[in-house]
Amino acid sequence: LKAQTDKGLIRLGNKDFKHGNYSEAEVNYRKSLEKEYNAKAEFNLGDALYEQKNYEEAAKAFSAVTERNTTSEIEADSYYNLGNTMMAQEKYAEAFEAYKNSLKINPNDEDARYNLEYARWKLIQQQQQQQQQQDQQDQQQQDKEQEEKDQQQQQQQQQQDQQQQEENQEQQQQQQQQDQQQQQEMSKE
């Protein structure tokens, strides 16, 4: 009777899932798992969470299935769905690893093979974009440092120009004083 109840909850969850009632399906799968662990219920829970865009919890469910002793089909499908979940979160390196693990178990899965290559492509794009952003930040930092250096040089040049101007004025004043003294001396004679 206990196994019947657990399977009944799974069937009820499957029915809810089929009709698009993902939150109800989630509840039924969780109730089933509370009674007794069942890899299929955990897998289906992951699917229900994924459909609700609760990717972190879905990833936990799929990962839990892969860590249990299950059939190779469920394990391969769990890795595949884990890959899809990681792709939805733009975690391309993790998605790549999940698809790779799925293909180790089921090397004939063409969908997993396609998704593996797509994840690889997205990962390369992401890395290139990150490199471009880093290069841009580095360039901005260099530009800022150069601008500060230019401003310092400009200030130093202005100070030097001002000092030179003051020295020139002082020399002119001294020269004028000397000229006046000479004129006074000449006028006395």
Go through each PLM region and give its residues.
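TPR-adjacent "capping" and linker segments in tetratricopeptide-repeat scaffold/adaptor proteins
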Residues: 1-8, 69-72
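Alpha-helical segment of the N-proximal tetratricopeptide repeat
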Residues: 4-35, 51
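Short, charged, low-hydrophobicity "junction" segments
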Residues: 28-36, 89-96
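Feature detects intrinsically disordered, low-complexity acidic/polar segments
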Residues: 47, 52-189
